[in-house]
């Protein structure tokens, strides 16, 4: 994470501009006086630098606030270098080298955001793999079917970086990578947008079955996003997981599925190679979709009504069925005219962390609006109620 540590620094006069960067204000934490935020704007993007006075070490650590992450990371490093220079920081250590920033200014075209597919997905267009790991199966399918477009979903950063490197080295152009929870991602896709959906060797969670990706809610979203003739393919070495998934399918009112055991797939993963050597059984469960699904009504309004009082916010947390909302930290600008509220909300599996920016009677989400999932919208309405 880009940062520097300083023995001392002095806030410059705000606002100030340098090399296209606007440092517009600093804000103090209302409950923790040893923490501050600095608001930065550049190229239509905005983010916070966070300053923490570490009393035990008798120094200051200045980094970007990861809740306001922007890409590429070179933008953040340059902002920190400018701030260090303008604040006359006495730097003790840093990881802000120019060489790294130049290399990190380049964005890979293969890494996409979930929002991208809300507008780009079309019926029967995508083959999707959830949890692609080393990418062996995903890349094999992409090379075998160059006419298809693939989405690989993964939350393990080293796996993502490895596959991104291979996509560039092997010049594979029909794959997009998304670092996001698959259960929430499917909710964002248009109906009938997937032709094949692969879930190969998911973590079985034998002692915590509630953490499995297969659930009634997941199956409902899978069926909705599969086009007519689309297939959901589960491949697992866990008999318990296989039986669990089969029972979920049988609970559906109408379903067509098939089963295979120890079927030789065109390509095997490193996990499958390991299980084969141990003479373990491999189970395939294939759900065949034969129904067209209408597009759901997706929440789109994440605006706030005019506020009566800027100081109405307070720390609080509320848990509802399937979602939650919380206000975690409160910050106020030096002139008292603006506030930043750090909030966490939405689905328990993949919560959003967002700042609310309040100036006068106006409130908005800092940086960008939340992902338009149902859980996020329900939480948004509760946040709006708290601030009214």
Swiss-Prot record:
The UniProt record lists the keyword tRNA processing: yes
Signal peptide limits: none
Annotated pathway: tRNA modification; N(7)-methylguanine-tRNA biosynthesis
InterPro entries linked: SAM-dependent_MTases_sf (IPR029063), tRNA_(Gua-N-7)_MeTrfase_Trmb (IPR003358), tRNA_methyltr_TrmB_bact (IPR055361)
PROSITE patterns reported for this sequence: SAM_MT_TRMB (PS51625)
Broadest EC class assigned to this enzyme: transferase
UniProt KW keywords: Methyltransferase, S-adenosyl-L-methionine, Transferase, tRNA processing
CDD domains hit by this protein: AdoMet_MTases
Pfam families assigned: Methyltransf_4
A GO molecular-function descriptor: tRNA (guanine(46)-N7)-methyltransferase activity
Cellular component, GO, one term: tRNA methyltransferase complex
Residues noted as binding substrate in the record, renumbered to the chain: 207, 237
Disulphide-bonded residues: none
EC number: 2.1.1.33
Cross-referenced Gene3D superfamilies: Vaccinia Virus protein VP39 (3.40.50.150)
Binding site for S-adenosyl-L-methionine: 129, 154, 181
Catalytic reactions on record: guanosine(46) in tRNA + S-adenosyl-L-methionine = N(7)-methylguanosine(46) in tRNA + S-adenosyl-L-homocysteine
Keyword Methyltransferase: yes
Recorded family membership: Belongs to the class I-like SAM-binding methyltransferase superfamily. TrmB family.
Function, as annotated: Catalyzes the formation of N(7)-methylguanine at position 46 (m7G46) in tRNA.
Protein name (record): tRNA (guanine-N(7)-)-methyltransferase
